[in-house]
Amino acid sequence: MKKLFISVPMKGRTDEAIRNSMEKMHKIAELTFGEELEVLETYIPPEAPDGANPAIWCLGRSIQKLAEADYFIGIGYTDYFHGCRSELSIARDYGIPCTYVDPYECEFLRDAVEIAAGRKEERKNIPTEVVLL
């Protein structure tokens, strides 16, 4: 059976929301690719070693899993989902057949969109001027 890599936003989301998104995306991928697919375990708990950047550490682990994939499903608009953007780029660059969903149109991804929108608002409050002393 061919293997499917599922890329979903994880930062700030509950385990339940992540698993629910993955389950729905699995079904979408099977319909899209026209065959039953084995899902690679891509949910990686953030257990980075001390001193490591947890987001980059998790991304590195997920890229190792991506090397085993025959197919890829992710999200289409990745502006605020940096790990998802990197995974999609790698899958495309290395010839893995890809499909994706629009996170703004999928109810099961609404929480991820809201979290990303909150991060966008936080960034607006970061001073952009540099003061030289």
Model-derived segments and their meaning:
Residues 1-133:
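Conserved catalytic or regulatory cores that recognize and/or transform ribose-phosphate-containing ligands
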